[in-house]
């Protein structure tokens, strides 16, 4: 299986969101505003930085960050198998 096929499979099964090209949990996906912007805290989470900011839902955000981090790590590990 080529890397492209693997990525296509992940996209098809909803494990990677096109904009981010990374595994994600649909329940943790950032809320999108009408103008297409996202909460900064989610941007920080998805950029692989620790969640910075304290607001309602911190526990959920941290859980989502951990999920995305763990999934991304697993994805990268899997991806390395297909890298030349």
Predicted regions span which residues?
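Residue-level detector of alpha-helical secondary structure
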Residues: 3, 7-11, 66-69, 73, ...
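C-terminal end-of-chain micro-motif
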Residues: 83-84
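Acidic, low-complexity, intrinsically disordered interaction modules
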Residues: 17-76
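Negatively charged, low-complexity tracts enriched in Asp/Glu with abundant Ser/Thr
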Residues: 1-24
């Amino acid at each position: 299986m080529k890397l492209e096929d693997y990525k296509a499979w992940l996209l098809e099964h909803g494990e990677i969101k096109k904009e981010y090209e990374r595994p994600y949990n649909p329940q943790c996906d950032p809320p999108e505003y009408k103008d297409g912007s996202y909460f900064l805290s989610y941007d920080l989470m998805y950029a692989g930085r620790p969640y910075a900011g304290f607001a309602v839902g911190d526990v959920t955000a941290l859980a989502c960050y951990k999920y995305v981090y763990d999934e991304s790590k697993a994805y990268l590990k899997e991806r390395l198998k297909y890298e030349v």
